[in-house]
């Protein structure tokens, strides 16, 4: 089964994505922080990461750099930033 990790601090966005992805028969895990997201990515090894760039505990670009040190898993980036 294809697995997806959602790294997003907004509960409603996580919920929306989870419902949509599970509706497509994907297995979904989530994390509210970048730190937790890296832990989940390392332990669960998802097929795809959906990442919010603007989380309170850091910069999503740093998450990508950290992840790329040991994985080439695909990442879809989300952002509500206007800058």
What do the PLM-derived regions correspond to, one by one?
Residues 5, 30-48, 66:
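Acidic, metal-coordinating helix/loop segments flanking the phosphotransfer/catalytic sites
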Residues 8, 55:
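Conserved acidic carboxylate
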Residues 10-29:
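Two-component/phosphorelay signaling modules centered on CheY-like receiver
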Residues 33, 59-62:
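Acidic catalytic/metal-coordinating carboxylates
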Residues 39, 61-73:
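Short amphipathic alpha-helix used as the core "switch/output" element in two-component signaling
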Residues 52, 79:
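Active-site residues of response regulator receiver
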Residues 56, 83:
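The feature encodes the CheY-like receiver
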Residues 70, 81-82:
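Short, conserved "switch-loop" micro-motifs in signal-transduction and mechanochemical regulators
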């Amino acid at each position: 089964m294809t697995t997806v990790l959602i790294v997003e601090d907004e509960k409603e966005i996580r919920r929306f994505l989870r419902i949509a992805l599970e509706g497509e028969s994907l297995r979904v895990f989530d994390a509210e922080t970048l730190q937790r997201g890296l832990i989940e990515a390392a332990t669960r090894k998802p097929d795809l990461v959906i990442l919010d760039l603007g989380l309170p505990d850091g910069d999503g670009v740093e998450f990508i750099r950290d992840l790329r040190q040991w994985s080439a898993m695909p990442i879809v980036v989300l952002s509500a930033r206007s800058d």
